[in-house]
């Protein structure tokens, strides 16, 4: 997202790095614009217009509970616009706890501490904090039908915590059910979503089992998910949902998606919007002003003054807006067009005479719209 190197570039580290350059007030101004522009009504309309029906929305616990047993409405102020747009365009929202108190893994996206510990599993206070935060969220949205469900914990990962992970989920579900009996609860396995040891049999009547999938070709995926389907969905009569898959070619995306659809497995592509990527629906460019910050953070440039740093941040936030982004049409069609695997389509309308960019080749699967001797990377990670 930031396209720069800062050691363990978690949310907190990035906030500290930005505040160091521009101060607290300008940091807040930047993040306000960043959040406002990252997803807008135009984004949601595009999603709906292209036959997608849900958005998985990553949350940080601090936006709802900045301190233990202290609750905030800041997160709802951000989400309520999404809820309104979701209702307007028939797009469901899945709320996903991407960063939990103490962190649920050692990765930057969980906002773990610099020592890389996942202290959600070692602190009962953090576990109670997570459960109370979910109760706060569930109570606020208990009667909102556009909220499809609550993804309780994104990609937990720590050795030897099968029993603890189940206890955490049970605490969260008990807290949610005290105020909300309507919404689905979604649980991911250990080791970044895929090890569900100790999480059976189901312990809520409205539970969904979720996985994440990035590694493996189409044939490998079919073998793996047939095992999941037979061993989980059919045995326990519960739905499966792939909360993340992505970071690969359009042909790979289409093949995996079609397999999931044939087997009644719900899915969500990751990521929605990224910096200069062809593997997200939207891509935004690095501005010249923001590049100076990247150079500085990467050790390849001088420290910008406050005005220069703030200008770089604001230019980055503006580039996030729908009107400034590039739409990755090929990926959009790979995920939404049912004829993608069998029929090529023009990238866009062209009226001669004029300039026809060579990169605007027809969209469609490999061997349908084009030929590439390596149209997927099964060992992406």
What does each model-identified segment do?
Residues 327-381:
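Extracytoplasmic
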Residues 1-184, 189-196:
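Active-site mouth of glycoside hydrolases
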Residues 41-44, 81, 175, 221, ...:
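Coil residues (strongly favoring Ser/Thr
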